[in-house]
């Protein structure tokens, strides 16, 4: 890519292609990590209700703003609607809590986290609820169609509280259905993307609809070692011999190669690190030039292995089949 941003439909907002992911940042480290990330140069922060650290993310952001390091308009803040709040009765209440938790006046992008409407869980019972089922033995679904949920997101845009809305972990059919009734078109699709799982057909079709793409889990199984069997057993892309060969050729890290691979496909990326050196390195990817041989090497790693799959968490939900 020749630019450092993706232009979003409808608003024309510039979404940075190099972002910082807030998943799995411990609450005790989160405020300082986000603050340091802003000092390092990050301007997009990707969060979610489900990550359980929105209060701390907000503190880090507001600390940087209050110290004059950045202005709010310099930042692009993303968060997500969790599954248990899909009902039209609960969307706005969760959104308002997320704004309050982060101490912000608006979000730049608000995403539906999964196309999975689960039974409502009162925040007084547990928050964030995750894939909570209480005393039940399986997931409990809510009778809440996506079109009602999306209409509530559109109202949030109308109120000036979210500049853009989009979806995560949606397949082609779910997006196709959404496009038949959406008054405000989704600006972004966020999905798992890496050389093991390039999802070329979905990516091509989504781009043809004018929807931009954010890639998560750019390093493959790294974030899933403690969550799934495939996360434990699959070779880390950061340690893969083929990725190392490309990295050695360009005198960069394997992480930088994987992020550059994504940028070359016009995906925004949201890696996370609490290590200052890696945090800086993950930003320094614009000048890396992968050639045709490099891309052939990386493309050969395709296995279609997905790591963020509710089926592998024991929920019996074949979401991506």
Swiss-Prot record:
Residues binding substrate: 113
Pfam family name, one: Aldo_ket_red
Protein's GO biological process: trisporic acid biosynthetic process
Pathway linked to the protein: Pheromone biosynthesis; trisporate biosynthesis
Enzyme active site: 51
Gene Ontology MF, one: oxidoreductase activity, acting on hydrogen as donor, NAD or NADP as acceptor
Enzyme class: oxidoreductase
Keywords on record: NADP, Oxidoreductase
Lineage: superkingdom: Eukaryota
Known EC number: 1.1.1.-
Annotated site residues (Lowers pKa of active site Tyr) in this chain: 80
Protein family membership: Belongs to the aldo/keto reductase family.
Role according to the record: Catalyzes the NADP-dependent oxidation of (+) mating-type specific precursor 4-dihydromethyl-trisporate to methyl-trisporate.
Protein name in UniProt: 4-dihydromethyl-trisporate dehydrogenase
GN (gene name): tdh
